[in-house]
Amino acid sequence: MGNELFLAFTTSHLPLAEQKLARYKLRIVKPPKLPLEKKPNPDKDGPDYEPNLWMWVNPNIVYPPGKLEVSGRRKREDLTSTLPSSQPPQKEEDASCSEAAGVESLSQSSSKRSPPRKRFAFSPSTWELTEEEEAEDQEDSSSMALPSPHKRAPLQSRRLRQASSQAGRLWSRPPLNYFHLIALALRNSSPCGLNVQQIYSFTRKHFPFFRTAPEGWKNTVRHNLCFRDSFEKVPVSMQGGASTRPRSCLWKLTEEGHRRFAEEARALASTRLESIQQCMSQPDVMPFLFDL
């Protein structure tokens, strides 16, 4: 029994050769003598015996639990908790000056560190734009001038209020395919048609799910525009010959597209009316959009 206790760990999980080696060591190594020889304790604060090397702690120097160590920790915690309250309060003028200096330093550091943000962030899987779509994006960016700093603040505050009013609601995806979304935008717009960016804006306005959805849905809109016979591309002529490139193309519904949407809109109204209204930012306008 003494030899088995002399092992530092069990050997049952080891290979057979190592188990035999451990047993051999047990035979040649002499275990310590039991019982231990008692010796008088010079400090007289514990039992009169000297612990051997097998023991993890020395019972002569271990404090009783819940007495000395706990009280010391509590004293340190009390000291740390009283330190903030012991500081003298600052004057009102000093506090206001420090607040102003802190705000100025934060604004300067944020203006230096933060790079200018782009208006739209596309995912890595975005398709390459065609020449017409690139021209369309350039036209949109050139026609829309950036607001000045004193005009940008009211715009941002208005957007924040709109977002906060709908922050507690998670919008679900509307039970509509991309043909329905594109046809809704085209048939409820001007007769001359819409470009791709205007179709995006119409979809985000009436179906808030696409405001926070991944950017891949825009690629699917382009795909459906190019590969369906329900939509036609209407090129726009040059602007008075002043520019060297044509304007971006517009999209319109064909006769087949109007007929197909009218049939599918009646079917959707009879089966998914409530679920579609729950996904819309303005459910009351659904009869007008779908011409029900």
Curated annotation (Swiss-Prot):
Gene Ontology cellular-component annotations: chromatin; cytoplasm; nucleus; perinuclear region of cytoplasm
InterPro entries: Fork_head_dom (IPR001766), FOX_transcription_regulators (IPR052328), WH-like_DNA-bd_sf (IPR036388), WH_DNA-bd_sf (IPR036390)
Compositionally skewed regions (Basic residues) per UniProt: 149-161
Illness the protein is tied to: Defects in FOXR1 may be the cause of a severe neurological disorder characterized by postnatal microcephaly, progressive brain atrophy and global developmental delay.
A biological-process GO annotation: positive regulation of transcription by RNA polymerase II
Residue range(s) of DNA binding per entry: 173-272
Biased composition (Polar residues): 80-89
Cellular compartments annotated: Nucleus; Cytoplasm; Cytoplasm, Perinuclear region
Keywords for this protein: Activator, Cytoplasm, DNA-binding, Nucleus, Repressor, Transcription, Transcription regulation
Acidic residues bias spans: 129-140
Free-text tissue specificity from the UniProt record: Expressed in testis (at protein level).
Basic and acidic residues: compositionally biased ranges: 35-47, 70-79
The gene coding this protein: FOXR1
Molecular functions (GO terms): DNA-binding transcription activator activity, RNA polymerase II-specific; DNA-binding transcription factor activity, RNA polymerase II-specific; DNA-binding transcription repressor activity, RNA polymerase II-specific; sequence-specific double-stranded DNA binding
Spans annotated as Disordered: 31-50, 65-166
Induction: Induced by cellular stress.
Pfam families: Forkhead
Biological role: Transcription factor which acts as both an activator and a repressor. Activates transcription of a number of genes including the heat shock chaperones HSPA1A and HSPA6 and the antioxidant NADPH-dependent reductase DHRS2 which are involved in protection against oxidative stress. Required for normal brain development.
Result after altering M280L: Found in a patient with a severe neurological disorder; uncertain significance; reduced protein expression due to protein instability; protein misfolding; formation of nuclear puncta in some cells; loss of activation of HSPA1A, HSPA6 and DHRS2
Record protein name field: Forkhead box protein R1
